[in-house]
């Protein structure tokens, strides 16, 4: 079976800007690390293992919704749609939707977007494209912003109906203010054009605010190597910038995984889960490559947040984003739901 096509839509190379983002985050207060640092190929392998653990309810619930409601969700997608999947690291979940579209003989174009070229190739290789006649597949190598620009500006794409998939609770990784801005940006790029009345966003949100359930989900097996792998990746990126002939001993980079541990916390005031790295033994000097930044013992270097949305917060998110809620798909006892959103 021939390899599915991959289109490079990158406006710039993320790897080139990540070292600057690392330094900027570590010199800020509170200290942070950029989320993209955690999604190297090795990081994604650890995350995929972690997300399959029994206590990690978000993935399990989302799969149940797509498995049971796939036909109804597929019916909400217009014929001839361009489906842009902004979270395509694993197709197991969305596969139920694609199979439903095929069963309905609905001709659509599915584009899996990923920042990692190797991960994208792996994802596309797993698609049994020979089983599909009505759903056609391709990959997009780039960032969220690259994907939105592409769907808005590509002549043969921009006037077709669009369906943007934002599953995997991705919107929860943004602050509430930034989530509204990002969702509005998606709407402005993908829900406009000649077929805007037929275009939509399919968004998953988590409403669970039970601290024990949430923290148990984000401390299940696989999350620690996922978190610590980012330090190895950061060091590799920084060392790659060293010019030949420069003594590497002069330019030190102290990002040893064994010197750090992972912290999982529930923030009651903000209604979010917080994931951080903390020095294990004492103060850590990060070395000359990182401007000799000192991370104090017990000081948190935050790298991820997962916001949970109750009904009032969800309504405000949609209002601030300029979108209207249409259909909602969930199951009894589920904290996760998938929302159909249209331009207001």
UniProtKB/Swiss-Prot annotation:
Alphabetic keyword roster: Alkaloid metabolism, Methyltransferase, S-adenosyl-L-methionine, Transferase
GO BP terms, alphabetized: indole alkaloid biosynthetic process; methylation
Reactions accelerated catalytically: 4-(3-methylbut-2-enyl)-L-tryptophan + S-adenosyl-L-methionine = 4-(3-methylbut-2-enyl)-L-abrine + S-adenosyl-L-homocysteine + H(+)
Superkingdom classification of source: Eukaryota
Pathway(s) annotated for this protein in UniProt: Alkaloid biosynthesis; ergot alkaloid biosynthesis
GO molecular function, one term: methyltransferase activity
Function according to Swiss-Prot or TrEMBL: 4-dimethylallyltryptophan N-methyltransferase; part of the gene cluster that mediates the biosynthesis of fungal ergot alkaloid. DmaW catalyzes the first step of ergot alkaloid biosynthesis by condensing dimethylallyl diphosphate (DMAP) and tryptophan to form 4-dimethylallyl-L-tryptophan. The second step is catalyzed by the methyltransferase easF that methylates 4-dimethylallyl-L-tryptophan in the presence of S-adenosyl-L-methionine, resulting in the formation of 4-dimethylallyl-L-abrine.
Complex formation: Homodimer.
Similarity annotation: Belongs to the methyltransferase superfamily.
Protein name stated in the entry: 4-dimethylallyltryptophan N-methyltransferase easF
Gene from which this protein is expressed: easF
């Amino acid at each position: 079976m021939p390899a599915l096509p991959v289109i490079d839509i990158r406006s710039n190379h993320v790897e080139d800007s990540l070292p600057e983002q690392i330094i900027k985050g570590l010199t800020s207060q509170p200290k942070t690390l950029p989320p993209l640092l955690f999604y190297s190929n090795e990081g994604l392998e650890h995350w995929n293992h972690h997300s399959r653990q029994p206590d990690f309810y978000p993935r399990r619930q989302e799969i149940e919704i797509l498995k049971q409601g796939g036909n109804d969700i597929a019916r909400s997608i217009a014929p001839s749609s361009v489906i842009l999947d902004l979270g395509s690291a694993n197709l197991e979940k969305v596969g139920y939707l694609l199979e439903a579209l095929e069963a309905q003989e609905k001709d659509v174009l599915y584009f899996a977007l990923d920042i990692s070229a190797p991960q994208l190739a792996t994802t596309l290789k797993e698609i049994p494209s020979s089983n599909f006649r009505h759903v056609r597949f391709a990959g997009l190598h780039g960032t969220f912003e690259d994907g939105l620009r592409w769907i808005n500006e590509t002549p043969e794409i921009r006037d077709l109906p669009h369906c943007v998939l934002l599953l995997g609770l991705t919107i929860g990784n943004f602050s509430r203010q930034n989530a509204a801005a990002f969702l509005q940006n998606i709407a402005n790029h993908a829900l406009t054009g000649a077929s805007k009345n037929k275009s939509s966003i399919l968004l998953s949100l988590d409403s669970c605010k039970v601290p024990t359930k949430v923290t148990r989900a984000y401390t299940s097996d696989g999350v620690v190597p996922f978190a610590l792998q980012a330090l190895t990746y950061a060091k590799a990126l920084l060392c790659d910038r060293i010019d030949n002939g420069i003594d590497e001993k002069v330019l030190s980079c102290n990002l040893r995984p064994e010197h750090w541990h992972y912290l999982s916390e529930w923030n009651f005031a903000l209604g979010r889960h917080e994931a951080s790295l903390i020095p294990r033994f004492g103060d850590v000097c990060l070395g000359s490559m990182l401007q000799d930044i000192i991370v104090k013992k017990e000081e948190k270097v935050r790298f991820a947040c997962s916001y949970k949305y109750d009904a009032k917060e969800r309504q405000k998110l949609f209002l601030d984003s300029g979108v209207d809620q249409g259909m909602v798909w969930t199951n009894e006892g589920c904290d996760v739901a998938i929302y159909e959103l249209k331009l207001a």
